[in-house]
Amino acid sequence: PSLGGASGFGYTLAEQFSLATNATDASLVPMTLSGKWHAFSSALSGVSLPVYVSVPEKGFAESLLFTHRGLSGPSILQLSNYWRLGDAISIDLAPSEGLAEVLLSAKKTNPNKSINGVLSEFFPKSLLSALQAQWWPALADSTLHEIKNQQLQIIGWQLNNWSLVPSGTEGYRTAEVT
């Protein structure tokens, strides 16, 4: 990969001597996004936060980094070892909090706050604005007492269970290992 010491020389040499080799894949590699999620991530390039990311067989509680190409950071690099093209990944943006419960509780104690006012305790402002544009744009100017409990539950659930399908990985160019 891009560290300078790695090359395909060993594999080429093994093939010349008819030695068996295993197929290689880029590993510990950032994931790319397309469409609206590419634009979303690109606008947030440099924003990082602790998350829990998973595929059905494995998950990691580490930092996630939004990049101009998609997603990176320790959680995504680890997950890339288990993810397969076309599969969805799940991202819990606040793994230590049930955000539906947080929003419903805040509605009782601070009914004049907005969704972003409550969630600003957990997320950077830029991320909150981007999430709002995707998931609750019609509620941007609403206070909690104006929002139905079911809507708050859905928003909280989305934040704890964001599912998306990466378009690929950055491949061998940025892979840490093969």
Region locations from a protein language model:
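A glycine-rich dinucleotide-binding beta-alpha-beta segment and adjacent secondary-structure elements
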Residues: 133-178
